[in-house]
Amino acid sequence: MQALGLLGNAFVSVCQPASLLLMIAGVAVGIIFGSIPGLSASMAVALFLPLTFSMTPSMGMNTLVAVYIGGISGGLISAILLNMPGTASSIATTFDGHPMAKNGEAMKALGLGIVFSAMGSIFSFIVLTFCAPSLADIALKFTPAENFGICFFALTMVAILASGNMIKGLLAGMLGLMFTLIGMAPIDGTPRFTFGASNLMAGFDTLPTLIGIFAISDILCTAESMGSGKLETIEVKKVKGFGFSMKEFVYHLPNFLRSAIIGTGIGILPGIGGSTSGMLAYVTAKNMSKKRDEFGKGCPDGIVATESANNATIGGAMIPLLVLGIPGDGVTAMMLGGFLIHGLSAGPLLFVKNADVVYGIFAACMVCALIMLVVEWTCIKGFVQVLKVPKHILLPLILVLCCVGAYATNNRIFDVQSILVFGIVGYLYHKFSLPTTPFVLCFLIGEMLETYLRRGIMQYKSFGAFFARPIFDVFFFIAIGVLVWSVYKEYKAYLDKKKAA
């Protein structure tokens, strides 16, 4: 009852005009940063961090929360309209979001993304409010062995993504893994495949790679179509409300709930992040859907799964931050700096000494999710006007944005050069009909997989010791089961096709 009283007082405090204005501004800035490739939520929070110095601790942290929520959600806008993931979390949104936009359903795709990203956020914030301490205890049980198990399980999802053409899918995934090996090895820092080039020592950054694979390759393909006169104009169908009916909303609820649980669970584990949760939710939705053949061609289920999961990661990532003082991702690491600026110490004592700030954050999270919903819905008709801009004007602008965003990631020209390299890689994937999804999944998971494997072997002295960890065993054997089942289905389909011929 005391907790509910504190939460009620926090809602009253958060809904004061000054606090609301700051949160609206924070959400709006976050959306802008999230929608521009290369300008991430981390950058937006870093920009706002010194501005909160003169505010009260509660108001300052609430403003940072607003920027965080807006930044993660904003990535869906460019992912759907331009096939450019604004943030790493919105990678999987491009798989079905942009095909829907090409089919004239841009407003429906945006509507689905906006509604279910808000719902995913609210779901995780409810979990954060009422279950944070107990979930933090579970997170402490995850050692490098368990994290390796999760990453290995995620990696085997390539077999599902490659269904229909296993050889091409596995080839695409292997190329993604190869790129993660370039640079210094995790833990010991041994240079690999750098060929004496100092720029390759740090490897390829995630955002420039994704910008190249999606945006630059799309520019090359579109330019080729313009040259051959095959370019089709994109029609934007007008819709009422968010573009979907109540019947469709009810249909998507099981997918939403499953994906939000995945997102919250992944968020609790430090270092894994929203991009992984979005991909896992997408693959799970595809595997459990009756319309799996429609995924990648403009299936609304894909958007619902991804946006529910990556926004649910926000609340999950804040659980270890608030309860243990351990940041769950890059943005919460910035927010840890916010606590220090305001003289607060994140961890168990925060709930005792500064309960008003903690419950203020809980209330601000829920209010900011609603603000994000209203702000994006208000601007939805303006967003889709991007599709009406002539391609000969739009493509150079996108190219400039891509280059600026890539440079802003680490302030090095090498990232601008790398988006061009990966743009050519993505273009070749398109020409040879290789799927980009396995490449992206393997690129995202590869480095984490190796890092947790090395840490686990250092801790337990051998890989065999991993099998003494029950949680690892569950993920490992489920992953093996997925692999065996996928190969069996592929072989059975091959035999059926051969018999029919």
Q: Model features per residue range: what roles?
A:
Residues M1-G60, P191-C299, V384-Q385, L401-Y407, ...:
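Helix-loop-helix hairpins and the membrane-proximal interhelical loops
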Residues V27-A41, G71-N83, V158-S163, A260-I272, ...:
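Transmembrane alpha-helix interface/packing and boundary motifs in multi-pass membrane proteins
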Residues I32-S42, I80-I91, F123-V127, I266-S275, ...:
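Short helix-coil transition sites and intra-membrane helix breaks within transmembrane domains
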Residues A41-L51, L64, A79-P99, F130, ...:
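Re-entrant/interfacial helical elements at transmembrane boundaries that shape
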Residues S58-N62, P99-F116, K290-G302, G330-A333, ...:
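Membrane-interface alpha-helices at helix entry/exit sites of multi-pass transporters
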Residues Y68-A79, G86, C299-L324, G328, ...:
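A structural-propensity feature for long, helix-poor, extended segments
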Residues I69-G74, V115-V127, F179, V304-M318, ...:
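Membrane-embedded alpha-helical segments of transport systems
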